[in-house]
């Protein structure tokens, strides 16, 4: 039996990454940012001069893609040829194309396998868009973190990103492979009128109570 896995899903700018990282620290679990994995593939595809919409070309480079996934302490890292990727993952070009890359079934299959490997030997808090529905469908600890479109748009603007929240939601929810959707047994957490501290306290208390 694998160690516990906490699944935190939600749309863009819902606050799920910050919440998941703090929950992991609270519990002493490893934090896994799956979005960084999809962003790394997106960045690499663009570096090769491949159009993200050219599905066959993207699929062709997957077997030899020089990305590796590890940890820095209790936080997951993504590396390209041994170099940890950082600002590359937050470039506007990466952000604009990650939904297209994430919709390719072969990309998702590759990364879901890597994501599950993290949980083979240690407990994890994993955030993304399909953690509770695809990666860990059997975990009892599922949370869907969201916020109003207006609040999320303001958060994106504060990060210096100019993409449309509505368009990103449409792409993530409409894709055929592992669309963004709330698991039937997940708890909905609306962060529109909550501070990060309140959200973390609510989820951490729920987890502690259920693990007791």
Give the location of each predicted region.
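Hydrophobic anchor at the beta1->P-loop junction of P-loop NTPases
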Residues: 8
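Walker A (P-loop) phosphate-binding loop of P-loop NTPases
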Residues: 13
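Conserved lysine of the Walker
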Residues: 16
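Hydrophobic positions on the alpha1 helix immediately C-terminal to the Walker A/P-loop
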Residues: 19
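Post-Walker A helix-loop "phosphate-sensing" segment adjacent to the P-loop in P-loop NTPases
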Residues: 24-34, 47-51
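ATP-dependent small-molecule kinase phosphotransfer cores
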Residues: 37-123, 150-151, 162-167, 196-200
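Small-molecule kinase domains that catalyze NTP-dependent phosphoryl transfer to phosphate-bearing small molecules
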Residues: 70, 115-122, 129-138, 158-202
């Amino acid at each position: 039996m694998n160690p516990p896995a906490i699944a935190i899903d939600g749309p863009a700018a819902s606050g799920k990454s910050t919440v998941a990282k703090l929950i992991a620290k609270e519990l002493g679990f490893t934090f896994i940012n799956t979005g960084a994995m999809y962003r790394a593939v997106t960045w690499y595809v663009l570096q090769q001069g491949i159009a993200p919409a050219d599905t066959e070309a993207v699929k062709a480079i997957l077997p030899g893609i020089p990305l590796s996934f590890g940890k820095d302490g209790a936080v997951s890292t993504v590396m390209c040829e041994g170099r940890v990727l950082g600002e590359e993952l937050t470039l506007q070009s990466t952000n604009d194309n990650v939904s297209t890359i994430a919709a390719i079934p072969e990309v998702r299959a590759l990364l879901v396998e890597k994501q599950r490997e993290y949980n083979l030997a240690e407990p994890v808090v994993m955030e993304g868009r399909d953690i509770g529905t695809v990666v860990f469908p059997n975990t009892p600890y599922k949370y869907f973190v969201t916020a109003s479109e207006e609040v999320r748009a303001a958060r994106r603007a504060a990060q210096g990103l100019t993409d449309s929240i509505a368009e990103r939601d449409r792409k993530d929810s409409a894709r055929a492979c592992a669309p963004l959707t709330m698991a039937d047994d997940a708890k909905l957490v609306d962060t529109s009128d909550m501070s990060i501290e309140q959200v973390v306290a609510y989820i951490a208390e729920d987890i502690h109570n259920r693990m007791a």
